[in-house]
Amino acid sequence: MKLFIILATATLLIAATQATYPRDEGFDLGETQMSSKCMRQVKMNEPHLKKCNRYIAMDILDDKYAEALSRVEGEGCKSEESCMRGCCVAMKEMDDECVCEWMKMMVENQKGRIGERLIKEGVRDLKELPSKCGLSELECGSRGNRYFV
């Protein structure tokens, strides 16, 4: 009887977790709203966008930690520069609107997971990515304001 109760409780916890934190096959899209057009673009560019994640992690975290994590996740980045190049490929292939939505998703998904200081550093790095990739400054936001997270 105790075993049944434990198994039933575990099953409910797993079901509740999956309902609360819906996951896509790739990125954790969390509860961030993204247009279907941008969702498609993110999915199509997911391998390269993962390199954006790795680039930012390498920049704000200890390089050895990020390198080990990169190997485990198979991102294929040997350096910050190689991650940035892969990231730029995705950003150049996506509409500006979708790059903006993706950036917002990235920040929203990290809130509560990492410290405030790391969030600020990550936001700074995200804002710099378009210029590092040779793209014009993104105009994100409903009123044409510069991108603000």
From Swiss-Prot:
Changing residue 38 to S: No effect in IgE-binding activity. Gene3D superfamilies: Plant lipid-transfer and hydrophobic proteins (1.10.110.10). SUPFAM superfamilies: Bifunctional inhibitor/lipid-transfer protein/seed storage 2S albumin. Changing residue 127 to A: Decreased IgE-binding activity. Changing residue 121 to A: Decreased IgE-binding activity. This protein may be helpful in engineering hypoallergens for buckwheat allergy. Determining IgE antibody titer of the natural protein in the blood serum using the ImmunoCAP method could be a reliable way to diagnose buckwheat allergy with a sensitivity of 90% and a specificity of 89.6% using a cut-off value of 2.74 kUA/L. Changing residue 124 to A: Decreased IgE-binding activity. Changing residue 100 to S: No effect in IgE-binding activity. Seed storage protein. Belongs to the 2S seed storage albumins family. This is 2S seed storage albumin protein. It comes from Fagopyrum esculentum.
